[in-house]
């Protein structure tokens, strides 16, 4: 660890020659870290908020999937975010657990408070660096931004040996200044430097140029892992991430199903399968167990309510569907004529099995597992009994029905609540007030709150406050 006050030698403008990022196919593939931010950036998708139990379920699925880093949340953002980061950090093993913080002492200390019991903690600090952010958001000059970035990393290193720094809006930051910032934060102790395309503005050739420039012009770049975090506003998040890997990036930040703010983030399943399918080109490898991609994708879709488009690459229901006669003929003769990936490699099993009232417990358990649910024997029996009752009323049971029955097992309340009634007071432009009344194990309980984006949201917030889920 570097001591405070170590001078930084700025030699960013002098190009340095390095070995090519991609190794020849005959060499051992270069490892690429997968940093999943479904629980933080992904949750910023409108309507994608998750409770603690759901976040914990996704976190455990991400560990099983093989991700290297789980960004569990932004601890200072809310008490709920703090609790989820704290509980996930304490429970998860097998992956680094990361918390986000701005470059100020309060954020960083709060992040560490949430992460302190993690087996492998990481503090991720960020500060905008582009000229438009410096002028209009931060109202700071280059020297002030540089000093605050260094101070943030230095503070984080006092708590944690693993510190990531992100120059927000890096893709629109002047390359000379970006190189100076990266060199300074590495000297201050950053172990990962993440390059975000915050607004999804970059192109693949531009992203390649930025990463290559950092590798060539930052003298101490070998002391940190270069990461990339791309948004999908122009539909280029995956392409930009692949270009960054090709230029030498060692970590890709992404989300399951590509969910995230606005148009979303780089899709984990797409970038992972691109790197695996075209390993001949990229000469890299990840730790991802790809056969768990589809189950994890469906789990996240079921929890967030953001369904996967049928034609989405890798995990969409049509990703391995062939209807054209010529394609079907080729597939019957040799699958490789029209398939560059095997469906079983991503966890999609081709089956004509239709579940109905004559189906058995084993078939139901197999389908539930394929949808991403690990049921205990007791949970399976409960779901099976409910499934049989439903099958008597419906000719055919769909995946959504099975998922709904399984979700009931994971959403069970620790105590019995009986709904009694509610009162809502609202007006145009006003924040609604809700009074919710329930019986908790026969004892009357009530709560009144003034919050929410409309009466329905307010009711759900009241339920959450009263029940604690």
Model region roles, listed by residue range:
Residues 34-37, 70-72, 95-101, 121-125, ...:
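Hydrophobic faces of well-ordered beta-strands that scaffold small-molecule active sites
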Residues 63-66, 89-96, 115, 119, ...:
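Structural signal for hydrophobic packing residues in well-ordered secondary-structure cores
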Residues 430, 448-468:
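Conserved mixed alpha/beta catalytic, RNA-binding, or beta-rich assembly cores of soluble enzyme
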């Amino acid at each position: 660890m570097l001591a405070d006050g170590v001078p930084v030698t700025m030699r960013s403008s002098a190009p340095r020659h390095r070995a090519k990022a991609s190794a020849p196919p005959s060499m051992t593939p270069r490892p690429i870290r997968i940093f999943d931010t479904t629980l933080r950036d992904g949750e910023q998708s409108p309507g994608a908020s998750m409770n603690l139990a759901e976040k914990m379920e996704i976190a455990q699925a991400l560990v099983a999937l093989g991700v290297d880093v789980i960004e569990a949340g932004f601890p200072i953002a809310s008490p709920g975010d703090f609790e989820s980061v704290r509980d996930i950090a304490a429970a998860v093993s097998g992956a680094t657990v990361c918390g986000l913080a701005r470059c100020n002492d309060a954020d960083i200390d709060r992040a560490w408070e949430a992460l302190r019991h993690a087996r492998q903690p990481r503090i991720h600090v960020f500060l905008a660096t582009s000229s438009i952010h410096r002028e209009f958001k931060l109202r700071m000059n280059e020297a002030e931004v540089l000093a605050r970035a260094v101070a943030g990393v230095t503070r984080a290193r006092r708590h944690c040996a693993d510190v990531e720094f992100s120059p927000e809006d890096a893709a629109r930051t002047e390359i000379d200044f970006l190189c100076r910032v990266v060199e300074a934060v590495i000297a201050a102790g950053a172990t990962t430097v993440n390059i975000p395309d915050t607004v999804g503005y970059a192109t693949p050739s531009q992203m390649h140029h930025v990463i290559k420039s950092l590798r060539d012009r930052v003298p101490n770049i070998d002391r940190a892992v270069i990461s990339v975090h791309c948004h999908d506003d122009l539909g280029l998040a995956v392409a930009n991430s692949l270009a960054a890997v090709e230029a030498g990036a060692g970590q890709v930040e992404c989300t399951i199903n590509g969910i995230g703010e606005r148009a979303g983030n780089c899709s984990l399943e797409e970038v992972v399968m691109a790197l695996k399918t075209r390993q001949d080109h990229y000469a890299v490898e990840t730790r991802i167990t790809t056969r768990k991609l589809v189950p994890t994708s469906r789990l996240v879709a079921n929890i967030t309510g953001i369904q996967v488009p049928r034609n989405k690459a890798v995990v969409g229901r049509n990703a391995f569907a062939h209807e054209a006669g010529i394609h079907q003929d080729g597939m019957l003769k040799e699958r490789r004529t029209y398939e560059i990936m095997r469906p079983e490699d991503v966890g999609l099993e081709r089956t004509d099995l239709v579940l109905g009232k004559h189906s058995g417990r084993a078939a139901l358990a197999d389908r539930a597992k394929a949808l991403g649910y690990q049921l205990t024997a007791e949970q399976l029996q409960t779901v099976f009994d409910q499934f049989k009752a439903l099958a008597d009323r419906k000719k055919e049971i769909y995946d959504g029905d099975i998922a709904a029955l399984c979700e009931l097992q994971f959403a069970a309340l620790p105590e019995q609540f009986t709904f009694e009634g509610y009162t809502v007071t609202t007006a145009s432009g006003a924040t609604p007030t809700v009074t919710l009344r329930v019986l908790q194990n026969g004892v009357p309980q009530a709560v009144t709150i003034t919050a929410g984006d409309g009466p329905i949201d307010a009711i759900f917030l009241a339920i959450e406050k009263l029940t604690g889920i």
